[in-house]
Amino acid sequence: MKLLHHAFCPHSRFARLALAEYRASFDLADEDVRKRRPEFLELNPAGTTPVLLDGKFPVSGASVIAEYIDETHGTNLGEHRLLPADPKARAEVRRIAGWFHDKFYVEVSEPLVREKILKLRLSSAEGGGPPDSSALQAAKKNIRYHLQYVGWLLSTRSWLAAEKLSFADLAAAAHLSVADYLGDVPWDESENAKNWYAKMKSRPSFRPLLADLVPGLPPSKVYADLDF
């Protein structure tokens, strides 16, 4: 299989974590969605990453990829599958994963990546230039209540959606990881969230993400530190 992705697209990071947790064999291929390659648009007319190619069959979208992998590789994890069998438990996993893929993305991870990473590669004509300070301030303000929500969830259960690891944890960690790279997560404001993220960073599936680098923009001091 091949995953078309962007290293700092949080949805792509989620797909990478899901594939790794299910011990699926896959290769990575960088995709610049701004170029709108006709070949890529044939695979995903929405023009967004990630897209998983299973042979010639395209699977588009982070959540769709995760559930596809669960259905095709679930026997690899047995009772430790990341999408529970119980319908109510599955609904809670999907709800929290959706919170990060939708709400957190719009309010935090997308503006941070756009302003601090993507603009570095763009000319002024393409929308590049200095970061929009108001957008960054809003994202940094928003992340605080998201972090408090993570902390509250963890005060009621062992993992974000249940008593064991699920796609909800992978989604939250994927989105928080890009903010963590940029040094924009106030970990000191939630001990529960910090301890949970330390567990996530220590998982073998997370190691490739911690090796990702943005040319000209080094990671925060704690990004690859498992005992931050």
Could you say what each language-model-derived stretch is?
Residues 29, 62, 189-190, 210-211:
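Residue-level detector of family-conserved "landmark" positions at structurally sensitive sites
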Residues 1-133, 227:
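GST-like domain detector, emphasizing the conserved glutathione-binding G-site
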Residues 34, 165, 215-216:
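Positions that flank functional sites
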Residues 78-85, 107-108, 160-163, 188, ...:
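Short, hydrophobic secondary-structure boundary micro-motifs
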Residues 213-228:
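Acidic/histidine-enriched, glycine/proline-rich intrinsically disordered or flexible terminal extensions
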Residues 44, 63, 108, 154, ...:
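Short, flexible helix/strand-to-coil boundary loops that buttress conserved ligand/catalytic motifs
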Residues 100-202:
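GST-like fold's C-terminal all-alpha helical module
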